[in-house]
A protein has these predicted regions:
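Short secondary-structure boundary/capping segments
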Residues: 21, 43, 68, 124-126, ...
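A contiguous loop/helix-start segment that scaffolds small-molecule binding in enzyme catalytic cores
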Residues: 2-3, 61, 71-76, 132, ...
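Class I S-adenosyl-L-methionine
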Residues: 1-110, 115, 209, 221
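Class I SAM-dependent methyltransferase SAM-binding "motif I" and its flanking Rossmann-like core
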Residues: 1, 12, 83-157, 201-202
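Short beta-strand/turn micro-motifs composed of small residues
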Residues: 32-34, 80, 137, 165, ...
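Residues at the C-termini of beta-strands that transition into short coil/loop
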Residues: 34, 55, 108, 128, ...
């Protein structure tokens, strides 16, 4: 018996990993976050599997289901959206399982920011433009931010920002980042990346709030900000430059 924490990816069933799908097919018990994971992603669970939508459950209720499965020697597929290591709240679940001596493993998934970049047909790190991607969020009622993890501190880097779970703070994001990136800095909102109803909005930092309001987006959207989103005249990477010699491409005699 084992609890399998599975990253289901951003939403499209084709984007779950082979390993993640295998564990869902093999597990007699399946728990999934129904608010973020489409039911189609768990359709491969055994026909007689016990399936639970955890959207309305507490941590204790989730752990009790896992503990009961352990007592019955039944493996559990615990399906999270995106990659479970990022805003997946698996840390507290793993801590409880360790206390109880219940074995588990983690299967990574395609993260939302990767699906958003694919939808935008863009690279998030470009030579001479930005080589850093910051994954962050803003404070909400459910989660405070550590004191040093502020938009201003991140903005000073002028790195590419992927801001999660923060669409309701869109005006705050514009106000706090504009002094560092400038009003005309390219930005984008990707709503429900990879889902059938995906929306991709390109704009500038100054027009972010207006775009969000016009599209009536209130949740499940990723905000991307940074010069890479509009860069066209960037230099080529040295990776494929014939003058760049390395162990796999030695200097020609």
């Amino acid at each position: 018996m084992k609890v399998h924490f599975i990253g289901a990816g951003p939403g499209d069933p084709d984007l779950i990993t082979v390993r993640g799908k295998k564990f869902i097919m093999q597990s007699p018990i399946c728990l999934y976050a129904g608010s973020l994971v489409p039911e189609s992603l768990i359709s491969d669970a055994p026909a007689d599997a016990e399936v639970f939508d955890t959207a309305s459950m507490t941590l204790d209720e989730i752990i009790e289901i896992m503990a009961d499965a352990y007592d019955r020697d039944l493996s559990v597929a615990r399906v999270h959206s995106g990659d479970p290591s990022l805003y997946g709240a698996i840390g507290e679940q793993m801590r409880q399982l360790r206390k109880r001596g219940i074995p588990f493993d983690v299967t990574p998934g395609v993260p939302a920011y990767a699906a958003a970049a694919a939808a935008l047909e863009t690279e998030l790190t470009l030579p001479g433009v930005s080589q850093t991607l910051i994954l962050t969020r803003t404070a909400m009622q459910s989660s405070e931010m550590p004191s040093d993890e502020t938009l201003a501190n991140f903005g000073r880097t002028r790195a590419t920002l992927a801001i999660h779970l923060s669409i309701r703070n869109i005006q705050k994001i514009r106000t706090e980042l504009e002094p560092f990136y400038g009003a005309e800095c390219p930005a984008a909102i990707v709503y429900q990346a990879s889902w059938p109803n995906q929306k991709v909005l390109r704009c500038t930092l100054a027009t972010l709030p207006k775009k969000v309001r016009a599209a009536k987006i209130t949740r499940t959207a990723l905000i991307l900000i940074g010069p890479v989103l509009g860069a066209r005249d960037f230099k080529d990477s040295a990776l494929y430059n014939p003058q760049h010699v390395h162990i796999l491409r030695p200097k020609k005699s």
